[in-house]
Regions:
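N-proximal low-complexity "stem/linker" segments adjacent to membrane-targeting elements
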Residues: 1-43, 54
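Conserved donor NDP-sugar-binding/catalytic core segment of glycosyltransferases
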Residues: 60, 94-131
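Glycine-rich, basic loop-to-helix element that forms the pyrophosphate-binding segment
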Residues: 61-77
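Short aromatic/hydrophobic "clamp" motif used to bind/position activated sugar donors
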Residues: 82
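The conserved acidic donor/metal-binding loop of glycosyltransferases
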Residues: 86-90
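Short, flexible, basic/aromatic active-site loop/helix in glycosyltransferases
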Residues: 129-149, 153, 163
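A short, conserved alpha-helix in the catalytic core of glycosyltransferases
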Residues: 151, 156-163, 170-197
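Active-site donor/metal-binding and catalytic loop motifs
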Residues: 192-221, 232-238
Length: 272
């Protein structure tokens, strides 16, 4: 087949510019609350000239859970940066120009970042955040920006080019800030808490659904990060965070024993 014929059939892949700089995506259960949030964003400089606003309508029941809806946002938004935020936040302090500057600083610090937020943690005891709640008390702790492994869900910002998605085997309205950070890390990206000061009108609820989903997320990732053999069509190796375990399990003699075990197990199950 000639080159001209191929060109007529196939489409050459190119990097297309995004239509918008920011997409602001929200789950809506209360139109008045969402309207106040939207007005505060526009007043802060997120105008429709180069920003799009998307919402998932949950005013008549949960048409979307967070994982399903956010995956829709991440797939459909045509913006360089995708903001996923609660409907009960107000941009009373920092503005669009502040966020532009913070992201430029973050890009200079680490161009391999994929997710940012205003509150997160990078170990069991150290928080990094700046946020004001409905009592107008500003809570600022830790160092910003700071690399984290989990982010609060009130305000998340995702770099579209990272091509992230949330887990397909989790559902509900909690822990997706942790899930997206873990997935970004698995894909080779970093996640950060940055300084972007806003007002969050609620403190969140740690109800039974929170603890149930937290348990599901723990179970999912405990299984995902388990030690195990990986067999390709041309090689095999053992995955483990422990270097010594990897070295032992990759010894040819050990692999031979494991291979014999699986072969015998397969024959036994096939027989019965």
């Amino acid at each position: 087949m000639s080159v001209p014929t191929v060109v007529n059939i196939a489409k050459k892949e190119t990097l297309l510019p995004y239509k918008y700089q920011y997409a602001i995506c929200t789950f809506v259960t209360n139109w008045d609350e969402y309207g106040r949030m939207l007005d505060s964003f526009i007043a802060a400089g997120f105008t429709t000239d180069d920003c799009e606003y998307r919402y998932a309508d949950n005013t008549n029941g949960n048409s979307f859970d967070a994982y399903q809806g956010i995956n829709q946002f991440l797939q459909n938004a045509d913006a360089k940066y995708i903001i996923i935020c609660h409907q009960d936040i107000l941009l009373k302090f920092d503005k669009r120009a502040d966020l532009d500057r913070r992201l430029a600083e973050l890009e200079a610090l680490d161009s391999n970042w994929a997710v940012a937020g205003n509150a997160g943690t990078n170990n069991p005891y150290l928080l990094s955040m700046k946020i004001t709640h409905s009592d107008m008390v500003t809570h600022k702790v830790g160092v910003l920006p700071s690399k984290v492994n989990s982010l609060d869900e009130n305000f998340l910002l995702v770099k579209k080019s990272a091509n992230l998605a949330l887990s397909g085997d989790l559902s509900g309205f909690h822990m997706y800030g942790t899930d997206i950070c873990l997935i970004a890390s698995c894909l080779g990206y970093n996640t950060y808490a940055i300084e972007f000061s806003l007002q969050h009108l609620s403190m969140g609820r740690l109800d039974a659904s929170f603890y149930a989903l937290s348990k599901k997320l723990q179970t999912k990732y405990a299984r995902f990060f388990r030690g195990r053999y990986i067999k390709t069509t041309v090689t095999r190796f053992y995955l483990s965070p422990n270097r010594l375990v990897r070295a032992v399990m990759d010894i040819s003699f050990i692999q031979s024993i494991v291979r014999l075990y699986y072969k015998c197990s397969y024959k036994w199950f096939k027989k019965y």
